[in-house]
Amino acid sequence: MKKIGVVIPIYNVEEYLRECLDSVINQTYTNLEIILVNDGSTDENSLNIAKEYTLKDERFILFDKKNGGLSSARNVGIEYFSGEYKLKNKTQHIKENSLIEFQLDGNNPYNIYKAYKSSQAFNNEKDLTNFTYPNIDYIIFLDSDDYWELNCIEECVIRMKNVDVLWFDHDCTYEDNIKNKHKKTRMEIFDFKKECIITPKEYANRALSVGSRDISFGWNGMIDFNFLKKIKLKFINFIINEDIHFGIILFASANKIYVLSQKLYLCRLRANSISNHDKKITKANVSEYFKDIYETFGENAKEAKNYLKAASRVTTALKLIEFFKDQKSENALAIKETFLPCYAKKALMIKNLKKIL
């Protein structure tokens, strides 16, 4: 039975987190290893809710870290499953129905304060000292204000044989202050009505035929974890729209992509998500990793976000140019020719900013 690694970043989602986590623990497919990454939440209950679910389900491990943005939280999951962290138990004795505390021993690039796991996962004190990362077959990301259909993992796993990536469709729920409601999903724009297996070149050709340059990938499906480790792909830190760079390199490196037109993911579009900043930001609630830019722009959230968006595009374009220098395969070249000019052109929009750091 294949083991699935689930990575869930958490940031100020006390209103939505239970619905998200309930959709995970009630999946019809149960062989899961679930990482919760609290990215410096400042609300009252996000961390407490995460601890509650970690306590009652031994499949969970919770990392509590300094705020660093969505990319850093997802990368904690990738690095943990890759065996890049050594955990040292802070808790010396097991108490029934309690959380065992761990600290990172050595390399700690994302300033992880503590890790927590349920006492149910350990039989004795020796288990504490021998605790290590699980070996997973596939990895999938879920944003903590969203949720899955209860058959999501099962539908993915049965289709992952001999493919590197599975891409599924999603549905959206909208908050009242979100504009552009009820837009078509990328799956609908690309007109994939039936499930199929495609090559990256075929994806690029479909993108050209429908006039779309959308190739983002974060929570959009499942990834073969050995493939992900082989290509050494992670999310770029301290940018927004990090799933564009991730998606382009993921697809350019893949051989086969499974297209599943089922809407298995429920995406909640709201203003103050982990990946979004808007005019409602104040000095009191601005996230830590965004604070320097916010203050540089005189606490003008709109200008600060415009800069972050432009700088993110430049960073993305430069990283993509560097990646494609050494790519010779037909699939990679098709992705490059279809998508790189678009994102390089967007990067040049930084020259239109009124104020540059």
Feature locations, PLM:
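Nucleotide-sugar donor-binding/catalytic module of glycosyltransferases
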Residues: 1-290
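C-terminal subregions of glycosyltransferases and related glycan-biosynthesis enzymes
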Residues: 268-357
